[in-house]
Amino acid sequence: MALSEDTIKAVEATAGLIAAQGIEFTRAFYERMLTKNEELKDIFNLAHQRTLRQPKALLDSLVAYALSIRRINELYELKGKDLPWTGHLAELQGFFSVAERVANKHTSVGIQPAQYQIVGAHLLATIEDRVTKDKAVLAAWGKAYEFLADLLIKREEEIYAETEGPEGGWRQTRTFRVEEKTRVNEVICRFRLVPAKGGASVVQHKPGQYLAIFVRNPELFQHQQIRQYSIMSAPNSAYYEIAVHKDGAGTVSRYLHDHVDTGDLLEVAPPYGDFFLRYLEAGEQTAADTQASSEFQMLQGRAVNFAAEKTAPIVLISGGIGQTPLLSMLRFLAQKEGRETARPIFWIHAAHDSRVRAFKEEVDAIREAALPSLRVVTFLSEVRATDREGEDYDFAGRINLDRIPELARLEAGHANPHYFFVGPTGFMTAVEEQLRARSVPDDRIHFEMFGPFKASH
């Protein structure tokens, strides 16, 4: 249902007032909602409330939606009248990309339509408390929120159906058993998860996606905790593998390291996430392509299909534990293309030091067995006396793509490499700035940033 001009003007006029309050507005919203609806503490990441990550993310999303609402409404008006609308999609790509990321995150924690009503009521109450008591403006925001909620609810149902429908799929959570737990180093543990029901299959993930792990232990923490961990195994129908970095302040990471062992059971949501390597053979179509509503389907159709671009170079850049989704991509490429690959593939990893660098042996094994042309480059922020240049590391210091001449030669030769990168916020900012400085086109830059700040690209 289209929004009226009065509604759009009222929302546009007050967007700046909300933005001016900064995270104080969204912090007040969360405090109100989580006080009056304590059951939602089982869903929201309370650590992100304390660090203000979630309030910051909500503020950015809310203001961006308000400022784009006119163009979004125009698109849906045209769709409703069966008039050409796809021309509007390019300028709204940022909005729909963020909406897709939010929808995936919501499905991973099991958000249901009724919960949108709770959120909407507290959002309007916060606007009334802190921005305006004007009934017309509040009514306008109510309609605008309902418009957005309907869009997300529809998309989330499509995503639920996509992961539930195929063989091995499910909705909400399913019980898995820890088949193997391996301590990789002093801060990283690796878990292989299989269905608790022996012999059951799992839906194949897209390389780059994550699992949500649901943890409840009243002796250690009051509320259920949900965290997303990238899948590091290649897509298969038998198991998932994740790696967990033990964060000193991390409730769930410490719990998984210290209290979960081989044979223990965990509740797990299906694979989700909008950051993945798209690889469709000729004539192949995924459930996502057929079930997505047209505007999201259009965005997916614009994603690069690496099965069709057989010679497109791929550069995988990771910081710390950020290598896990890229490991899934690398393993997938090794399976799909292997020694016959016609594309240059780079594995560039940055770690603090050699003691916490993980999965070196696995990357070396992939290169030896399947991808002999794989170029592996390692940056260590701190080099120890026992580290050997050329074996334990290639460059000392923080990541600097200018120190890798092969990349410059690829770019100069118009090979147009695709860059996938994942890591902590500071690392991600540095890599993105370096790629922009090298004039890498937007459609060649693909990233996922830890935490709720930025959408995958």
UniProtKB/Swiss-Prot annotation:
List, separated by semicolons, the cofactors it needs.
Answer: heme b; FAD
Q: Where does FAD bind?
A: 210, 227-230, 449-452
Site feature: Influences the redox potential of the prosthetic heme and FAD groups: 105, 448
Q: What class of enzyme is it?
A: oxidoreductase
Please give the Gene Ontology molecular function terms for this protein: FAD binding; heme binding; metal ion binding; nitric oxide dioxygenase NAD(P)H activity; oxygen binding; oxygen carrier activity
* Annotated active site: 116, 156
Cofactor: how and how many bound = Binds 1 heme b group.
Segments forming domain Globin: 2-157
Q: Where is this region: Reductase?
A: 168-456
The alphabetical list of record keywords is: Detoxification, FAD, Flavoprotein, Heme, Iron, Metal-binding, NAD, NADP, Oxidoreductase, Oxygen transport, Transport
Q: Which CDD domains match?
A: flavohem_like_fad_nad_binding
- UniProt site positions, description: Involved in heme-bound ligand stabilization and O-O bond activation: 30
Report the EC code(s) recorded for this entry: 1.14.12.17
Q: Which GO terms describe its biological process?
A: cellular response to nitrosative stress; nitric oxide catabolic process; response to toxic substance
Q: Where does heme b bind?
A: 106
Q: What does this protein do?
A: Flavohemoprotein involved in nitric oxide (NO) detoxification in an aerobic process, termed nitric oxide dioxygenase (NOD) reaction that utilizes O(2) and NAD(P)H to convert NO to nitrate, which protects the protozoan parasite from various noxious nitrogen compounds. Therefore, plays a central role in the inducible response to nitrosative stress. May also be involved in O(2) detoxification.
Q: Which family does it belong to?
A: Belongs to the globin family. Two-domain flavohemoproteins subfamily.
The domain-related comment in the record is: Consists of two distinct domains; an N-terminal heme-containing oxygen-binding domain and a C-terminal reductase domain with binding sites for FAD and NAD(P)H.
Q: Which PANTHER family match?
A: FLAVOHEMOPROTEIN (PTHR43396:SF3)
Name assigned to this protein? Flavohemoprotein-2
Species, as recorded: Giardia intestinalis (strain P15) (Giardia lamblia)
